[in-house]
C-alpha cells in the first residue's frame, strides 16, 4: 500500500520528498481579506504592539537620561541608570516579547520596514501592508505621547527619545548604519519565518521571536552611538512627531530611506540568493 | 510480524536496533558532485555575508563604545557612557546566535574558520568546502571591518580599529592559552549542539542549537576580553588586522590563528574520540553504547 506512487503529486510537478510548500505570492489586492475580522484584528494587534514598544523603550531612554543627569541626580550620576546596554535590551527584549505575542495574529511585524520587506517578498498583500504601516505609525505616535503625557517635563528636557545623527557623524554614515542595521533585522525575520526551515525543525517554530529580538538588540548596540538607532520608521516617526524638534525632523528622512533600502536588500538576498527562487539559474540545479 | 521485523533489521543492520539515529558517513576529502551544486556556492555566499555582518556589528559596537567613553570626546564623566565591555561581549555572542540561526540550514552556520577546521577534522565537511568557507569567512571579515572604517574612519583609527592584540601585562603564552581554551569551549559547544545522538534524544528538533553556541561566545568574551580582546575566530582577528594595519596587531596575529586552530583540534578530538567513543569502536575492546 505504501509503495503506491502519489500520481497527483507527480503530475503537479512537485518534489515528493519535500514536506513543505512555499505559499503562493500574496495578491496585491485581496478583496476577500477586506471582509474578514482577522485583518482588522491583525491591524489592531500591530497598533497595540507598536504602542507598547514605543512606550517601554522611550520611557527607558528618558528614565536613563534623567538618572544620569548630574544636575538632577548629583555629580556622580554618570553611572546611574540602566546604561546604554539597558536601552539596547529594552528595544531588543520588547521586540522579542511583542513578536512572540502577535506572531500568530498579525505576523508580528511591529516595524514598517519589516512589513515592506515581506511585501516585496509577496508574503503580504498591498492593502494589508499599507494598513499595517498606518497602524504601526499611529501606535508609535500614541506610545511616545503616553510617555510625554506621564513625564512631560523630563520628556522635553532629555531629547524625547528622538532619533538624530549624533555629533561627529555624517549624514551618509547615519544612512549606511540604518541600511545595514535594517538588513540584519529583516534578514533575520526572513530566516525565522522560512517555511523550509520550519519543515527542517519539524514545524516547531518556538524560537522564531528570540533571534529577531536579539537582532534588534545587536543592531542597537552597534548603532546607538551613531543615530540612536532607528531601523524602525514608525519608532523614529513617533518620537519626531511628539518631540517636534527641527533637528529630529531634518534627519527624519534617513530613518525612512535607510530602513526601506535595507529591507529591500534583505528581501532580495533571501528570496533570490538563499532560496534561489529566481529560476533563471539554468546552469545550477537548485535544491531550494 | 513485529518480531520478525525486529530480528530482520537487527541481523541486517548489525547490533543495537534500538538506535533511531545514524551517524552520517565521513565527508569525502574531495566531493566532485557538490562542486556542481548551487547549494555549495549559496553556502559560501551565506558564510561571506554572515561574517561581514558579524564583523560590522561587533567592531562598530567596539568603536562606538570607545568613542562614548572617551573623556576628551564625550565629557569628563564619560566612563560609564557606552554599552560597556559587557555590551561588547553581548554583541559578539548575540550576533553569533542570530547569524548561526539564520545560516544553519544553508551552510551549517560556521562563521568562524576554527569551527570549520574542527568540523573538517571530524570529517563533517569536505576539504574543498572547508577551504571555500574559510576563504569566504576571511573575505567577509575584511569587508565587514572595511565598512566600519568607511563609515567612521576617524574614530576607527583613533580607537584601535577593534583589532585583537595582547593587552599589556599579559605574556604571549597567556594569550595563546586563553585563545586555545576559549576556542575549545566554542567548538565543543558546536559539536554538542550538532550531535545526531542528542538530536535523536531531543526528538530531532534542533531549534535550540544556535543559542548555546551564541552563549559560549558570550561567555568566552567575558573571560578573555581583558587578555586579548578575544579572538577565538581567526577571520575576526584577520579582518581587523588587515584594515587597521598597525604593527602591534600584526605582531600578535599568529596567536589568533594558532590558538583557535589548536583549540578546535582538541575539541574535535575530545568530542569524537572520548565522548562519542570513536576510538573504542575502532579498538573493539569495549562494548560501546554510543
UniProtKB/Swiss-Prot annotation, chain A:
The chain crosses the membrane at residues 42-62, 81-101, 130-150, 172-192, 206-226, 254-274. Its main location: membrane. Pfam families: MIP. The keyword Repeat applies. It is a multi-pass membrane protein. It comes from the Eukaryota. GO terms for cellular component: membrane; plasma membrane. It is found in: Cell membrane. GO terms for molecular function: water channel activity. Keywords: Cell membrane, Membrane, Repeat, Transmembrane, Transmembrane helix, Transport. A motif (NPA 1) lies at residues 111-113. InterPro entries: Aquaporin-like (IPR023271), Aquaporin_transptr (IPR034294), MIP (IPR000425), MIP_CS (IPR022357). The keyword Oxidoreductase does not apply. A motif (NPA 2) lies at residues 232-234. Aquaporins contain two tandem repeats each containing three membrane-spanning domains and a pore-forming loop with the signature motif Asn-Pro-Ala (NPA). Aquaporins facilitate the transport of water and small neutral solutes across cell membranes. Belongs to the MIP/aquaporin (TC 1.A.8) family. PIP (TC 1.A.8.11) subfamily. NCBIfam families: MIP (TIGR00861). This is Aquaporin PIP2-6. The gene is PIP2-6.
Swiss-Prot record, chain B:
It is found in: Cell membrane. InterPro entries: Aquaporin-like, Aquaporin_transptr, MIP, MIP_CS. Homomers. Can interact with PIP1-2 to form heteromers. GO terms for cellular component: membrane; plasma membrane; protein-containing complex. One of its GO terms (molecular function) is water channel activity. Keywords: Cell membrane, Membrane, Repeat, Transmembrane, Transmembrane helix, Transport. Its main location: membrane. It is a multi-pass membrane protein. It comes from Zea mays. A motif (NPA 2) lies at residues 233-235. A motif (NPA 1) lies at residues 112-114. CDD domains: MIP. This is Aquaporin PIP2-1. Aquaporins contain two tandem repeats each containing three membrane-spanning domains and a pore-forming loop with the signature motif Asn-Pro-Ala (NPA). The keyword Transport applies. The gene is PIP2-1. Residues 1-20 are annotated as: Disordered. Expressed in roots. It holds the Pfam family MIP. GO terms for biological process: protein heterotetramerization; protein homotetramerization. Belongs to the MIP/aquaporin (TC 1.A.8) family. PIP (TC 1.A.8.11) subfamily. Induction: Expressed in roots with a circadian rhythm showing an increase at the end of the night period, a peak during the first part of the light period and then a decrease. It comes from the Eukaryota. The keyword Ribonucleoprotein does not apply. The chain crosses the membrane at residues 43-63, 80-100, 131-151, 173-193, 205-225, 255-275.
